[in-house]
Amino acid sequence: YRFAPGYETEDFDSVLDWAAWPGAAGGFQGAVEMCNNNGACRKLSGGVMCPSYRPTRNERDAVRGRANSLRLAMSGQLGPDAMASDAMAETMKLCVSCKACKRECPVGVDMARMKVEVTAARAAKHGIPLHDRLIGNLPAYAPLASGLSGLSNLVQSVWRHVPGLASLVSRLTGFT
């Protein structure tokens, strides 16, 4: 059995509309439960699925591994707020949202769409990281930044000579 006796999912407020997805639980939970562990996401040649699993060959980086992690989180087996946890973010980190899973999975699991839910749950609990806000607002400040290229070049040349400054800026902004 894929589910232990007494398996139930906890309520989850999704940000996307999952009404069209089948499954015993329906909605987002039903979409996650569509993964039947057939392992098509673990193929190493032919097709495109799953580009993050192929180099790592780590089950966590396969669509099936991510779906199983979501299933554990939804059923409360990973503790409270598991959808917004660091562990869940790490599980989803290498998903490149290419949607190869949706195209090539025999049951059409759409992990890119599920990643949106995890990202939204994490943002609701912890806020949006500075790195993501900087990238998201790039169009707003890009014209100003382009005018400050000389200052930027000066700062970059200085911080190479100040021990620890580059790593501090990297930790603060999330850029390496």
Regions found by a protein language model. Give the residues of each.
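Non-heme iron-sulfur electron-transfer modules
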Residues: 1-9, 46-87, 108-133
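Short Cys/His-rich local motifs and their 1-3 flanking residues in nucleic-acid-associated proteins
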Residues: 37-40, 52-55, 97-103, 107
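Flexible inter-domain linker/hinge segments
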Residues: 1-51, 57-61, 70-74, 153, ...
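Iron-sulfur-cluster electron-transfer modules
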Residues: 79-176
